[in-house]
A protein has these predicted regions:
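N-terminal, charged low-complexity regulatory/assembly segments
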Residues: 1-82
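A short, structure-level motif marking secondary-structure boundaries and short turns
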Residues: 65-67, 166-169, 224-225
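Amphipathic interaction/junction segments at domain boundaries or subunit interfaces
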Residues: 70-168
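Short, hydrophobic/π-rich interface segment
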Residues: 141-201
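Short, charged/polar, Gly/Pro-enriched secondary-structure boundary elements
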Residues: 162-164, 212-219
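Short, cationic low-complexity segments
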Residues: 184, 222-233
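C-terminal edge-of-domain segments
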Residues: 196, 202-212
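N-terminal functional module detector in eukaryotic proteins
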Residues: 206-208, 219, 225
């Protein structure tokens, strides 16, 4: 099925990104014989179409920066792929899809070092700007704590459309594969993420971010919980 044939309300929704489609097709190619691949992909498309018809319509469409590559709608497409192919796809492969969408932008920023005050302040400003965008759309409800020189950056989401979608349609079990990329992205900036909870299994998704040389990191060792989430003590 051509993407243009999908019956979605494009006045409020967007199509999955081309990079997301490429990643999903690569996993389908990995697990299915050639004669089945087109039919499997069409099942993913139809699931995407079906679930968007039951989904909220206030996420801003193309105007909202959260709806780009690796964003809310790509997460929805990845969940639809998981729904169709959960019997063959692995947890690590699901992580790889989101990593391949998100991490290229961070690879370009490897010169950033959050251990240095200049970059730490610049990161804080970026998060503060992101909060203003969130306040415009009220999709991800974001709160950034005041900046303090001697402490890590802290912000949290108390609402996350991807988590909301996962819980509503029964995909909460695969959300760790989509959330764990937050750790990998920070590591490329010489930073460490410390997290204790998410919007899927709690009331917020917390982000405490510091340089990878900060003593704070040793005080909050990382582990994987029974669901696959990367977390900190």
């Amino acid at each position: 099925m051509k993407d243009s044939e999908l019956q979605i309300d494009r006045s409020c929704h967007v199509l999955y990104s081309k990079p997301c489609k490429k990643e999903i097709l690569a996993k389908i190619t990995l697990h299915y014989p050639e004669v089945e691949r087109e039919a499997v992909w069409e099942q993913v498309q139809l699931r995407y179409e079906e679930l968007l018809s039951k989904w909220r319509t206030d996420l801003g469409g193309k105007k909202n920066f959260h709806n780009g590559v690796g964003g809310t709608y790509d997460c929805i497409a990845i969940m639809c792929f998981y729904d169709v192919c959960r019997d063959v796809v692995t947890f690590r492969e699901m992580e790889e899809i989101e990593e391949n969408l998100i991490l290229p932008s961070f690879w370009k920023l490897r010169f950033v070092d959050i251990n240095k005050p200049f970059w730490k302040k610049l990161m804080y400003r970026a998060f503060s700007t992101a909060q203003k965008h969130c306040d415009t759309w009220h999709d991800y409800e974001m709160d950034v704590a005041p900046y303090e020189n001697s402490k890590p950056i802290y912000y949290e989401f108390t609402a996350c459309p991807a988590a909301e979608f996962a819980k509503r349609f029964g995909f909460a079990d695969i959300m760790p594969a989509l959330c764990n990329v937050d750790y990998a992205s920070m590591e490329l900036l010489h930073a460490k993420l410390v997290r204790t909870t998410t919007c899927v299994d709690g009331c917020r998704c917390d982000y405490t971010i510091c340089g990878d040389k900060d003593p704070y990191v040793k005080e909050h060792s990382e582990y994987r919980d029974e669901n696959g989430y990367r977390r900190n003590k």
